[in-house]
């Protein structure tokens, strides 16, 4: 099981049809619930409909206090139409006697962050949900709406220019905590360590196999073609290939001692969409060290060390 199993990302399951009795119990026991935000007003208050109960999350209760400035406004506005977690702080009735609820998402996030600060460490495998992507990285909800950054360079061993070449918004993924700045409550993730070593990936292929790949780099000396997210090979230089092209290639040689795979392009194909699920070789636990390179490789080893910030 992932190390954050006690506080999962928002929106992984559909919220129930709430009754007033369910909300009364939640006031008493402090249960964490989820619902879909219907509206955000000009003061950045959020509104939800929980069965017959009209609910409000005041702006000061929408996000954790360590999120401020423009980031805070974006964090609030981006919740409209999406599920959020909350506790039910109180129940009352409006002027017409209809039930209303006052909610807090901030309290849930503060509790989750304290659990993370106590128990989550570098190397921990976590489940996450991709909530936004930029060229420099993917923003991933790793529990109760707490967002960590997964830099593009850490997504896979095969190079990509943008996270959308590997993920889609809303996708459930696994990741590894790379850096946890507990003082500033900032978490950086990595991902490639879960996608298998060079040998693990290369073992799926044999010389003279013809397989589909994606062009990831066009150089003067050849083109890099991704065979798997953590494995690429090199073809001869071709002027008709562009990054992102799909190709069929024949594997001419596999050389573990040099971490090299020689390919020959057979045909140019339409680009492929990112898969719904990724081929994870590791799905839980805490990593201390991960070595991508084969043991007998003549090149300097590619290693990830997981250590705490001093």
Each predicted region: which residue ranges?
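Single-stranded RNA-binding regions, centering on S1/OB-family and related RNA-binding modules
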Residues: 1-310
């Amino acid at each position: 099981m992932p190390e954050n199993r006690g506080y999962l990302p928002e929106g992984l399951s559909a919220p129930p049809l709430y009754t007033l009795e369910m909300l009364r119990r939640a006031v008493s026991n402090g249960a964490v619930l989820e619902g879909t935000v219907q509206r955000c007003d000009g003061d950045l208050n959020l509104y939800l409909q929980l069965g017959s109960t009209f609910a409000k999350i005041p702006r000061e209760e929408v996000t954790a206090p360590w999120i401020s400035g423009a980031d805070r406004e974006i964090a609030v506005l981006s919740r409209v139409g999406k599920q959020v977690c909350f506790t039910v702080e109180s129940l009352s009735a409006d002027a017409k006697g209809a039930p209303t609820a006052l909610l807090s998402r901030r309290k849930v996030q503060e509790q989750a962050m304290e659990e993370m600060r106590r128990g989550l460490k570098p190397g921990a495998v976590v489940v996450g949900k991709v909530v936004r992507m930029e060229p420099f990285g993917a923003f991933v909800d790793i529990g109760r709406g707490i967002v960590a950054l997964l830099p593009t360079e850490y997504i896979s061993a095969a190079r990509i220019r943008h996270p959308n070449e590997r993920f889609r918004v809303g996708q459930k993924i696994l990741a590894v905590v790379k850096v946890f700045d507990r003082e500033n409550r900032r978490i950086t993730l990595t991902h490639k360590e879960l996608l298998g070593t060079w040998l693990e990936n290369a073992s799926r292929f044999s010389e003279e196999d013809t397989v589909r790949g994606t062009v990831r780099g066009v150089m003067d000396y050849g083109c890099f073609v991704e065979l798997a997210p953590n494995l690429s090979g090199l073809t001869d230089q071709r002027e008709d290939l562009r990054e992102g092209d799909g190709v069929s290639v024949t594997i001419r040689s596999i050389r573990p001692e040099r971490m090299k795979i020689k390919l020959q392009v057979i045909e140019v194909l339409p680009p492929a969409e990112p898969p719904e699920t990724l081929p994870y070789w590791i799905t839980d636990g805490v990593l201390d060290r991960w070595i991508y390179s084969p043991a007998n490789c003549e090149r300097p080893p590619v290693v990830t060390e997981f250590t705490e910030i001093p």
